[in-house]
Design a protein with these regions (language model features):
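Secreted/periplasmic carbohydrate-active enzymes, especially glycoside hydrolases
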Residues: 1-404, 447, 463, 483, ...
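Substrate-binding/catalytic cleft of secreted carbohydrate-active enzymes
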Residues: 401-632
Length: 788
């Protein structure tokens, strides 16, 4: 099935002073091929880093502008110092401060023809003065913004920035109504309201605790000649035995007259160069080019080496005049094609059809295995080392996709995941409910365009999603209209990727075994693409992070995101546990069993209808009790090991619907083998052994859920006391064994046999399975059952 025609990205208005603002006025400029790729004798481009110690002063009464704190002659001797980049949370007096904070920095004039002042990331409002003159403002947290300062510089300069991370008054209500009634004012996604961040999402006064404000990314002076690059878009198109790359170059001429320059391009990996003569008109110019690459190496996710690897190309672009390089830019890109199966319904809300939500990369069907992701809300703390470490965790658990959940990470994440071959489902920065007036809608549309432009060239980004859990309910129809407009805009801008209107619609968020019901109820479901499922678990380190952690105090634990009453519903009252460690271990065992069961069920239903699954989520990014399988110190918990096993490329498993059986009952367990490799494994054997062992039974308590935390939206309340059979002692006597032969085809999921047993007396059992080819064990698994 052919997808839509792929074209270069369409342009749409962005936020004032965005780095993409010049593109809107770009003039189409003709180019002429030129001979040779000349070396240059002098480079006029570069940058001056303004990071380091800045002066700052909080402005609780908002008097700074009236009192002229932007005046370069103002003495700032009594102002304190702060490292930039940083977040307000790094300074105790600013951790819960929502008024303006003023920053000042002195610097010398650099030697350059053209100078731009670049802010790579400020959260959330910024107003900028240079030498007492106001340059402008910016709103948002993820998109860089800039000002031309060439003619405003002195020998000694004073830069002043007023930054405010506002308190969102749209977060209101009480208890669960906080989520339903909130009409937030600022599109910050999970960064200011979420059930996995500091505070208490059921308490609007605490929900925004330890905010994310600050100058959290570097500030730089960009130096160049009078003609410089604004941006480059790269759009790869796969063809038979070749690829065509659409190259859209935006460059600005800051002079008053047209000027002829050379545009030099080089793709390093294929050792090819091109040179063009360009007549750059005053203002921004758009140059459209194409480059044919024969027998291209394609970008594939890391876990399919039989298909390819995440190959990247490097495009070096230079603007040259009279042997001088006025500016240069390096863009890395991958050649890959992504298609999401199924057809959109008439409203564009979901995909339908037999291939709905099945993923195709470069024409090859790929079963998605992954999780939701947030590195930290305090983005000044990220680094290449942190992202590479998280990539190792993701790949170590056999995952090939993350959903960057209702926020945007700094560009470094996307660079690392391009290199590592990890696919990204990228949410726009909307979470739950918002105001939906025309002004807010237009703001969101401009920011959505910025998101797409900023990360357009990254092959790891395979989908844009406009909103997470928008809560389209009868008294909040505005959100539906907002999402319709965002979906239409994203579809018009980027024709190279699938667009999803709202997560939770079409894809599935399933919390059976947490927000009601039992996790084994998922066996009855047929979901094309679950993108959230999981339960909370307590890290053993949690006791070190908060005072008086045991016995648990509801208010303190809730501040750290713990849904204690739900934990007790599925684990039993904390009072029956002898220690914090015992309670924490029970939570991890329960989470591990739940995640393992979910993933195995989704893989049994592979392509019938399930195209993949994403757990919620990888890590608890701050000291908290959350849905992560890794704690904030990056220590894996039991749930991580469960996902690692359940996501293995080859899986042997049983399709069970109960783990506790009656005495004398004939138990029959269907055995399934799943192969995600696109290679035939041929003849293999499934071997199984049954042991007498000593298991652990975790028994819940129905009263906790209803008494402690009323949740009216639960559509499947807990009618039965949850009982979860978990590993206990690993020893035990072997009772029986067996084996059968199987043919394991490529990219398949098949029922291959059955294991049966019957016991007349109570017994604890451990079932061990292995998939064997010759002397090699390709996969193994184990289960725990009780006969009572």
């Amino acid at each position: 099935m052919e997808g839509p025609r792929i074209e270069s990205p369409k342009l749409y208005p962005v936020m004032p002073n965005s780095i993409f603002s010049p593109l809107l006025g770009a003039k189409e400029t003709e180019v002429t091929p030129a001979s040779g790729y000349k070396s240059v004798k002098r480079h006029l481009h570069g940058f001056v880093e303004l990071s380091g110690r800045w002066k700052f002063r909080p402005d609780p009464q908002e008097l700074g502008e009236k009192e002229g704190w932007y005046n370069p002659e103002l003495s700032d001797d009594d102002w304190e110092e702060m490292e930039v980049p940083s977040n307000f949370v790094d300074n105790p007096q600013l951790q819960n401060f929502y008024k303006p904070v003023w920053f000042r920095r002195r610097f010398k004039r650099p030697k350059a023809e053209e100078v731009r002042l670049l802010f790579e990331g400020v959260d959330y409002f910024a107003e900028v003065w240079l030498n007492g003159e106001k340059l402008g403002e910016h709103e948002g947290y993820f998109c860089p913004f800039q000002f031309r300062v060439t003619n405003k510089l002195r020998e000694d300069n004073v830069l002043v920035v007023k930054v405010q991370n506002p308190f969102d008054r749209g977060i209101r209500g009480r208890g669960f109504l906080t989520t339903l009634l909130s009409t937030k004012h600022y599109p910050k996604g999970v960064l200011n309201f979420h059930d996995c961040r500091p505070g208490d999402s059921l308490n609007p006064k605490l929900a925004q605790s330890l905010g994310t404000g600050g100058i959290y990314r570097p500030v730089k002076l960009l130096l160049s000649g009078r003609i410089h690059f604004d941006w480059i878009f790269l759009t790869p198109l796969l063809e038979e035995k070749s690829a065509k790359v659409l190259i859209d170059v935006f460059l600005s001429n800051k002079g008053k007259t047209p000027e002829k320059v050379e545009l030099q391009l080089e793709i390093r990996e294929i050792k090819e160069t091109r040179t063009y003569e360009v007549t750059a008109q005053p203002g921004c110019n758009r140059v459209r080019l194409q480059w044919q690459i024969k027998n291209p190496k394609l970008w594939f996710p890391w876990n399919h080496p039989e298909l390819g690897r995440p190959y990247l190309y490097s495009l070096m672009a230079r603007i040259v005049k009279d042997d001088e390089c006025l500016d240069e830019r390096l863009e890395r890109f991958g050649i890959r094609e992504v298609r999401l199966g199924g057809e959109l319904d008439k409203k564009g809300d979901r995909r339908i059809g037999p291939e709905a939500y099945q993923w195709f990369i470069n024409g090859k069907k790929i079963f998605v295995k992954g999780t939701n992701y947030l590195s930290t809300e305090w983005m000044s703390k990220v680094s290449r080392e942190l992202y590479e470490g998280d990539a190792r965790l993701i790949k170590g658990a056999n995952m090939n996709m993350v959903r960057v959940h209702a926020h945007l990470e700094p560009p470094l994440l996307y660079e690392v995941f391009d290199e590592q071959g990890i696919m990204i489902w990228q949410d726009f920065t909307l979470q739950w409910g918002y105001r939906a007036d025309r002004e807010f809608r237009e703001k969101c549309k401009r920011m959505l365009a910025e998101m797409i432009y900023l990360y357009y060239n990254h092959p790891s980004v395979v989908l844009w999603c406009c909103h997470n859990e928008p809560l389209w309910i009868w008294f909040k129809v505005g959100n539906k209209g907002l999402d319709d407009e965002l979906f239409e805009l994203a579809t018009s801008i980027d024709s190279s990727r699938p667009i999803h209107k709202a997560s939770g619609k079409g894809d599935s968020h399933i919390y059976l075994g947490w927000y009601g019901g039992l996790f084994i109820d998922v066996r009855k479901r047929r979901d094309p693409f679950p993108t959230e499922f999981g339960s909370q678990a307590i890290s053993l380190g949690f006791k070190r992070w908060i005072e008086d952690a045991w016995p648990p105090k509801m208010r303190k634990w809730r501040y750290h995101d713990a849904q204690l009453s739900i934990l007790c519903t599925y684990l039993g009252s904390w009072r029956k546990y002898k220690s914090f460690e015992e309670f924490a271990l029970a939570s991890q065992l329960y989470q591990a069993e739940l995640l393992k069961y979910y993933v195995e069920q989704f893989r049994i239903k592979k392509y019938n209808p399930t195209g993949g699954c994403l757990s919620f989520w990888l890590l608890n990014w701050w000291p908290s009790v959350g849905w992560g399988v890794v704690d904030h110190e990056r220590n894996p918990m039991l749930g991580y090991e469960a996902l690692k096993q359940a996501y293995s490329p080859l899986l042997v498993c049983v399709d069970w619907e109960r783990s506790i059986f009656k005495k004398g009952e004939e138990v029959r367990l269907p055995v399934w083998v799943v192969n995600d490799w696109h290679e035939d494994e041929g003849k293999c054997s499934v071997k199984w052994k049954l042991f007498r062992t000593k298991n652990r039974l975790i028994e819940g308590s129905r009263k906790w859920l209803l008494a402690e935390l009323p949740l009216p939206w639960l559509n499947l309340p807990v009618f039965h006391v949850p009982r979860t059979v978990c590993p206990g002692e690993e020893g035990g006597k072997q009772l029986s064994e067996g084996s059968f032969e199987v043919e394991v085809g490529p990219d398949s999921s098949q029922e291959v046999g059955e294991i049966s047993f019957k016991f007349a007396e109570p017994i604890d059992l451990r079932l061990e399975l292995s998939l064997v080819k010759g002397k090699r064990v390709l996969a193994s698994n184990r289960y725990h059952f009780l006969v009572r």
